[in-house]
A protein has these predicted regions:
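N-terminal glutamine amidotransferase
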Residues: 1-186
Length: 186
């Protein structure tokens, strides 16, 4: 069982709070999938690209004393590789210890960036886009929205998914939706 919701504002501007609207719809579907919630939302394109990635799973934080050092090492490796490729990080946000949002400037091949970054053990890119942001984590919509500040997300459209794992693990990697690697905004 899962739940899916979406919204499109054809004449929306940057003042439409789709994060709050999506959270409300997905929270109403939490009985269809309480394990994890994911959002794919399209905000305003400001000319930069948004890189969302994780350096661990949420469950990893409970299982190992060494994970916190590994998270720091992975994040340092991500930063070093971005610098090596000439990616300029304009803004960094870390809604959780393991999930990160970078606003970047780069005019080269983003597939090369994605491959180089994902080659770091434990690192997974969730999305890259000029307007797409893919956010997913464990818990229902209110939990994920609170963690990531999604009730302040303005944009034009989005789709979301609540998941009850039946055949795979309960983790961020298995949560929906997925980014269409390596395509920007898909």
């Amino acid at each position: 069982m899962c739940g899916i919701a979406g919204i499109i504002h054809k004449k929306a501007g940057k003042d439409v709070n789709i994060g709050e609207q999506m959270t409300s719809m997905l929270q109403a579907l939490k009985h269809r999938g309480p394990d994890s919630t994911g959002y794919a939302m399209y905000g305003e394109d400001n000319g930069n690209q948004i890189l969302r990635f994780k350096v661990a799973e949420a469950a990893d934080l409970e299982g190992s004393y060494d994970i916190h050092a590994a998270i720091i090492d992975r994040l340092e490796a991500v930063n070093a590789r971005l610098t090596e490729l000439g990616v300029k990080v304009v803004n960094k946000e870390s809604p959780t210890e393991y999930a990160h949002r970078y606003e970047v400037k780069f005019s080269g091949d983003m597939k090369k960036v994605a491959d180089f970054v994902e080659d770091i053990e434990g690192v997974e890119i969730l999305s890259i886009g000029n307007s797409l942001e893919l956010i997913k984590d464990l818990g229902d919509a209110s939990v994920v929205s609170e963690q990531y500040g999604l009730n302040e997300f303005s944009g034009t459209h989005g789709i979301g998914h609540t998941r009850m794992a039946t055949e795979s693990d309960v983790d961020i990697r298995s949560a929906h939706p997925y980014w269409a690697y390596p395509f920007s905004d898909v």
